[in-house]
């Protein structure tokens, strides 16, 4: 987690990672090893970085962290097609990319560029996820499509990549991020919890397929 590093807060990981023999030790949260730049800098500090600094930070998180054996390493990248993405693809062989977009046309422009970039860099695009797909009223249960609906699915079909699922705009998703208890742990059978678990299963299946 490099840009806008909030991973540690969302996972409830507190404190600073240990350093053993010059290498950062990932912090454990909910059975997952995690490292975020947010663990290393003051929470109020603004990280204003140029391209070379971004690439240096990515290299540090990849090379200077004692990750050990992992099933999957997930890297959260900022929107767009900038230095962070190019640096990562040059540093390690990527198993695949998941593109996340809200449904409206203006957001899908960036998603389209992301798909094109990864394809040009020979990185498998595992698919698109539609975030904030709809708002579910907690009182009456009515769904309101604040940002439109189905844009990511249509874009995926147009570009010939899989559609991985949709995540609704829900108060409990916001609350889980603030509390540091992932929704798939705190409320796995809630609407949001089911959405996350379904997408995770689809992504895991796609990763296994590309690995073979």
What are these regions (language model features)?
Residues 41-88:
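Phosphate-binding/switch loop-helix module in NTP-utilizing enzymes
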Residues 179-192:
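C-terminal boundary of histidine-terminating zinc-finger modules
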Residues 2-3, 50-57, 81-84, 107-110, ...:
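Helical mechanochemical/support elements of P-loop NTPase systems and associated helical scaffolds
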Residues 200-212:
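Short, hydrophobic alpha-helical segments
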Residues 35, 58, 77, 90, ...:
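Glycine-rich phosphate-binding loops of nucleotide-dependent enzymes
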Residues 8-12, 45-47, 86, 140-141, ...:
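Short acidic, glycine/serine/threonine-rich loops at helix termini
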Residues 2-49, 55-57, 62:
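Phosphate-binding loop that captures ATP/GTP phosphates
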Residues 71-72, 78-176:
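Conserved catalytic-core segment of NTP-binding enzymes
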């Amino acid at each position: 987690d490099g840009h806008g590093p909030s991973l540690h807060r969302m996972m409830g990981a507190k404190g600073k990672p240990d350093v053993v023999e010059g290498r950062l030790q990932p912090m454990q949260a909910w059975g997952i090893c995690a490292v975020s730049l947010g663990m290393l800098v003051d929470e109020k500090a603004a990280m204003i970085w140029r391209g070379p600094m971004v690439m240096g930070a990515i290299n540090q998180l990849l090379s200077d962290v004692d990750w050990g054996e992992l099933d999957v390493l997930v890297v959260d990248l900022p929107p767009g097609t900038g230095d962070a993405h190019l640096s990562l693809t040059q540093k390690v062989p990527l198993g695949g990319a998941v593109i996340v977009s809200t449904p409206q046309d203006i957001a899908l422009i960036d998603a389209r560029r992301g798909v094109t970039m990864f394809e040009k860099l020979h990185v498998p695009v595992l698919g698109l996820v539609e975030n904030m797909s709809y708002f579910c009223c907690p009182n009456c249960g009515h769904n309101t499509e604040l940002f439109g609906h189905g844009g990511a699915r249509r874009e995926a079909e147009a570009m010939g990549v899989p559609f991985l699922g949709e995540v609704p705009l829900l108060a409990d998703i916001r609350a889980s991020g603030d509390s540091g208890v992932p929704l798939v742990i705190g409320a796995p059978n809630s609407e949001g919890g089911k959405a996350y678990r379904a997408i995770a299963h689809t992504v895991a299946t796609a990763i296994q397929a590309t690995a073979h």
